[in-house]
A protein has these predicted regions:
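A C-terminal functional module that forms or caps the active site or interfaces directly
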Residues: 83-109, 113-117
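General beta-strand structural signal in soluble alpha/beta enzymes
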Residues: 58-62, 92-93, 119, 127
Length: 158
């Protein structure tokens, strides 16, 4: 849970760097305590950590993907949800679920894939898989370049 919470905070910071206000959904097969197995408990623990460490972020969970996407459904299930609108940062309980979903959406939509974005390293570095298209290589190069410029500006500020 600690590692997922830290990754969530870093991902939210990345979104803000690109001018996007993060709306974070902590995903699970459970909606707000409807299951009490280790995976659902882990995501509830992530939420508790975020409440302590990053209370200004907008997030809620644990919740299913459709609940994250559909605000009216989320409000019916949890009227006092702290997440407004549609989530734009989806936090998965494990790398398997995240990678499967990422690749399925990428293939099914034919959209431009941005990522995966490597976080928590001292220099801009990102991952390109063998399936990366030229467009994806260009996009990831642009992200690395912006990342380097931001880091340089931060160092100059002290």
């Amino acid at each position: 849970a600690e590692q997922i919470a830290e990754s969530t905070i870093q991902a939210a910071f990345r979104l803000k760097l690109f001018g996007i206000e993060p709306k974070i959904a902590l995903l699970s097969h459970s909606n707000f305590g409807s299951h009490d197995d280790p995976s659902a408990r882990k995501m509830r623990e992530v939420r508790e950590i975020l409440v302590r460490r990053a209370p200004k972020l907008e997030f809620d969970g644990e919740m299913m993907g459709d609940t994250a996407w559909d605000e009216s459904l989320r409000r019916r299930m949890l009227p006092d949800t702290t997440l407004s609108g549609r989530a734009n940062l989806f936090v998965f309980p494990n790398i398997d679920a995240a990678n499967i979903t990422y690749n399925m959406i990428r293939v099914m939509t034919g959209g431009a894939a941005l990522g995966p974005i490597l976080m928590g390293v001292n220099k801009p570095a990102h991952i390109l898989t063998p399936s990366a298209t030229p467009r994806r290589v260009i996009n990831m190069t642009a992200i690395a370049s912006v990342d380097a410029q931001i880091r340089k500006a931060q160092l100059a500020e002290g």
